[in-house]
Amino acid sequence: MPDYTWFEGIPFHAFGISKETLQNVCNKFVVKDEDLILLAYPKSGTNWLIEIVCLIQTKGDPKWIQSVTIWDRSPWIETDLGYDMLIKKKGPRLITSHLPMHLFSKSLFSSKAKVIYLVRNPRDVLVSGYYFWGNSTLAKKPDSLGTYVEWFLKGNVLYGSWFEHIRAWLSMREWDNFLLLYYEDMKKDTMGTIKKICDFLGKKLEPDELDLVLKYSSFQVMKENDMSNYSLLMKKSIFTGIGLMRKGTVGDWKNHFTVSQAEAFDKVFQEKMAGFPPGMFPWE
């Protein structure tokens, strides 16, 4: 049975995440106005977003993404290592997190820091998480996808409820410094998403530079880049049979859910996400 770090009723994997760090993030960490924060629920495409943002910052030059690990370029604030790196870093910081809104640094909400929040169809998040967590030693293994569907719908998974995570962070969607992105839109029109991020960050890139960002952030290139594919961490034996990047597709859940599982999921989704405008989510 894997160890969990429990904080405010939510389980986190114990690999590099301590209660002390989570408390420090929540109550002590000071967000600076020039920081850029990348947020998403786990298995929503966070690393793809990091890669795109890093390449925008270098105008498509791949040297940085090919020589520095992705968790050093944009440290995970809830990890012990990431937190220590971020509090020592001078100047603008690139910060990544899967934390729910109520556990994030309170200082964010009085700062002018920019936030990019990435959302993915929770059904695909679920299937991706089922394979990822199930093939690692970080989380309890479900005996079937059906069991994992039950856990997910109740929020009994690492980082807690998808529904609560989304509802809370989306309350910021009208803020000027908040950019909402959907994984499905990123897949459908990656260049359009890259341009949207450039506009949000006030970055002007030439057409050839945009092409380089697109090229070096592709799924295949990322999968082969040891600085971005987490192969260096895989060697620590926390993952047994699967890499971080499995498919990266849209709609894979249809190959896994039974009709009754899909119906049960739809029922909970409608209940939990009531109140959002029609057409809010691109997968509806």
Curated annotation (Swiss-Prot):
Give the superkingdom in one word: Eukaryota
List UniProt keywords, sorted A-Z.
Cytoplasm, Lipid metabolism, Steroid metabolism, Transferase
Q: Name one GO cellular component term.
A: cytoplasm
Compartment(s) of residence? Cytoplasm
**GO MF entry, a single one:** steroid sulfotransferase activity
BP GO annotations? 3'-phosphoadenosine 5'-phosphosulfate metabolic process; cellular response to vitamin D; cholesterol metabolic process; ethanol catabolic process; response to activity; response to insecticide; response to nutrient levels; steroid metabolic process
Q: Which reaction does it catalyse?
A: an alcohol + 3'-phosphoadenylyl sulfate = an alkyl sulfate + adenosine 3',5'-bisphosphate + H(+); taurolithocholate + 3'-phosphoadenylyl sulfate = taurolithocholate 3-sulfate + adenosine 3',5'-bisphosphate + H(+); lithocholate + 3'-phosphoadenylyl sulfate = lithocholate sulfate + adenosine 3',5'-bisphosphate + H(+); (24S)-hydroxycholesterol + 3'-phosphoadenylyl sulfate = (24S)-hydroxycholesterol 24-sulfate + adenosine 3',5'-bisphosphate + H(+)
Q: Where does 3'-phosphoadenylyl sulfate bind?
A: 43-48, 120, 128, 183, 217, 222, 246-248
Q: Which residues form the active site?
A: 98
Instruction: Supply the Pfam families for this chain.
Output: Sulfotransfer_1
* Induction behaviour: Induced by estrogens and suppressed by androgens. Expression is under the influence of pituitary growth hormone and thyroid hormone.
According to its UniProt record, the EC number is 2.8.2.2, 2.8.2.14
Entry similarity comment: Belongs to the sulfotransferase 1 family.
Q: How does it assemble?
A: Homodimer.
* Described purpose of this protein according to its UniProt entry: Sulfotransferase that utilizes 3'-phospho-5'-adenylyl sulfate (PAPS) as sulfonate donor to catalyze the sulfonation of steroids and bile acids in the liver and adrenal glands. Mediates the sulfation of a wide range of steroids and sterols, including pregnenolone, androsterone, DHEA, bile acids, cholesterol and as well many xenobiotics that contain alcohol and phenol functional groups. Sulfonation increases the water solubility of most compounds, and therefore their renal excretion, but it can also result in bioactivation to form active metabolites.
Q: What is this protein called?
A: Sulfotransferase 2A1
Q: Which organism is it from?
A: Rattus norvegicus (Rat)
